[in-house]
Curated annotation (Swiss-Prot):
Name this protein carries in UniProt: Snake venom metalloproteinase H2
Main subcellular localisation: secreted
Signal peptide: 1-6
Organism: Deinagkistrodon acutus
SUPFAM superfamilies for this protein: Metalloproteases ('zincins'), catalytic domain
CDD domains (alphabetical): ZnMc_adamalysin_II_like (cd04269)
Known EC number: 3.4.24.-
Gene Ontology CC annotations of this record: extracellular region; plasma membrane
Catalytic-site annotation from UniProt: E317
Length: 400
């Protein structure tokens, strides 16, 4: 090991066993290439367990919609909408070279932060809080001291035990016509805004990292997740956020249909809150409700200092909107892995949807064909010019 640490406080909490690494960028820009702040592709070398690895990263170009907006409120209650330039963002996905099964979801905004899978093991990486140092900590999630060993659960309680998929995953034909595009609005309520001390940059980084993580998981379901807007209830809540997840979900859905849907083009909205929901519940969503003005919503508690765990809860609730139910014990996403649609969130890094989730999502889409997720939105890196005919559907799209 270059250096082995016994215990340190990182953003994810107190980590008992970690390795200090110094990632070295090895990308060579092509001759004459324009230097972006964050290149489209980057490679970093560092050591894990004393062994050199090469992390290959590619920018997640479809992360933001072309008309992405951020909304907050002034002290006198006025809504302030901005359209920040997000083309040159710092969110990447990738893999470890020479490991076919590896994946990575990384933000490169200030050092490397995120997670990667190497030889079947998931590692977290983040910069260490040492001034003028390139030092990063690499560790397994199991080495993070758990704040709370109590079970955390999704609040969807319908009993789907009788649900049997019509087809096996291997019988489903997959083609490009299965690809869907979900434009999502994330709403951060006032309790969460206060939790992060009103630091909107910190909140944005937290949310973007989550979306980058879940977009990787949703690729397996042939669904692109695109952020249309981030709204922060900076002055006060615009609905009554209660400890009852059911009441909060109902209020949020009604608010979306009455307000949000009329000013932002999107297909689905999720509320992030620091409110501690009753009992073990950390999230709730309507099932099979995509594109419905009141019901294409979910509520998620910001329940962990580990970004990945909140991200997976978000992925879980969105999947309910897509007609996906909780996994039964016969569902699998690979040997030894807990899958995203497990009704209980346990203390491990989860990345994958199960075979059951895949089948249920495909069946819901082929049976219901929710119309709002059919169109491919313009990406931030697309330069649009007026065209004749229907080539640019975006301009006249009728949402929901």
């Amino acid at each position: 090991f270059p250096y082995q640490g016994s215990s340190t406080i990182l953003e994810s909490g107190n980590v008992n066993d970690y390795e200090v690494v110094y990632p070295r960028k090895v990308t060579a820009l092509p001759k004459g290439a324009v230097q972006q702040k964050y290149e489209d592709a980057m490679q970093y070398e560092f050591k894990v367990n004393g062994e050199p690895v090469v992390l290959h990263l590619e920018k997640n170009k479809g992360l933001f919609s072309k008309d992405y907006s951020e909304i907050h409120y002034s002290p006198d209650g006025r809504r302030i909408t901005t359209h920040p330039l997000v083309e040159d963002h710092c969110y990447y996905r990738g893999h470890i070279r020479n490991d076919a099964d590896s994946t990575a979801s990384i933000s490169a905004c200030n050092g490397l932060k995120g997670h990667f899978k190497l030889r079947g093991e998931t590692y977290l990486i983040e910069p260490m809080k040492i001034s003028n140092s390139e030092a990063h900590a690499v560790y397994k999630y199991e080495n993070v001291e758990k704040e709370d060993e109590a079970h955390k659960m999704c609040g969807v309680t319908q009993n789907w035990e009788s649900y049997e998929p019509i087809k096996k995953a291997s019988q489903l034909i997959v083609s490009t016509e299965f690809q869907r595009y979900m434009e999502i609005v994330i709403v951060v309520d006032h309790s969460m805004y206060t939790k992060y001390k009103g630091d909107s940059d910190k909140i944005k980084a937290w949310v973007y990292e989550m979306i980058n993580t879940i977009s990787e998981s949703y690729r397996y379901l042939y669904i692109d997740i695109i952020v249309s807007a981030l709204e922060m209830w900076s002055e006060k809540d615009l609905i009554n956020v209660e400890t009852s997840a059911e009441n909060t979900l109902k209020s949020f859905g009604e608010w979306r249909a009455k307000d949000l849907i009329h000013r932002i083009s999107h297909d689905n909205a999720q509320l992030l809150t620091a409110t501690d929901f009753d009992g073990p519940t950390i999230g709730l969503a309507y099932v099979a409700s995509m594109c419905d003005p009141k019901r294409s919503v979910g509520v998620v508690q910001d329940h962990s200092s580990v970004n990945h765990l909140v991200a997976i809860t978000l992925a879980h609730e969105i999947a309910h909107n897509l007609g996906v139910h909780h996994d039964k014990s016969s569902c699998s996403c690979g040997s030894g892995y807990t899958c995203i649609m497990s009704p209980v969130i346990n203390s491990e890094v989860i990345k994958y949807f199960s075979d059951c989730s895949y089948i249920q999502c495909r069946e819901y889409i082929s049976k219901e064909n929710p119309p709002c997720i059919l169109n491919k939105p313009l990406r931030t890196d697309t330069v649009s010019t007026p065209v004749s005919g229907n080539e640019l559907l975006e301009a006249g799209k009728d949402y929901d």
